[in-house]
Curated annotation (Swiss-Prot):
UniProt KW keywords: Cadmium, Cytoplasm, Metal-binding, Metal-thiolate cluster
Principal localisation: cytoplasm
Highest taxon listed in the record's lineage: Eukaryota
Annotated organism of origin: Eisenia fetida (Red wiggler worm)
GO MF annotation: an example: metal ion binding
Name of this chain's protein: Cadmium-metallothionein
Subunit structure and binding partners: Monomer.
InterPro entries (UniProt xref): Metalthion_4_echinoid/annelid
GO CC terms, sorted: cytoplasm
Length: 75
């Protein structure tokens, strides 16, 4: 399973981590990867344009940047 930021099985950890199907909770993300975690998406911005958000996604419908709409809950 290489889907979660901050996990020992993540393909790329740290500042370069970019998870395709992030399912991590905000508390599970590494400090350097936090801004790229779906659970950390808020205030109309998605941390990762390619993410597919899990249950912890805080994005509301229509709030995400155009490049992240496919990955945002509600859009």
């Amino acid at each position: 399973d290489t889907q979660c930021c901050g996990k020992s099985t993540c393909a790329r950890e740290g500042s370069t981590c970019c998870c395709t199907n992030c399912r991590c909770l905000k508390s599970e993300c590494l400090p350097g990867c936090k801004k790229l975690c779906c659970a950390d998406a808020e205030k109309g911005k998605c941390g990762n344009a390619g993410c597919k958000c899990g249950a912890a996604c805080k994005c509301s419908a229509g709030s995400c940047a155009a490049g992240c709409k496919k990955g945002c809950c509600g859009d």
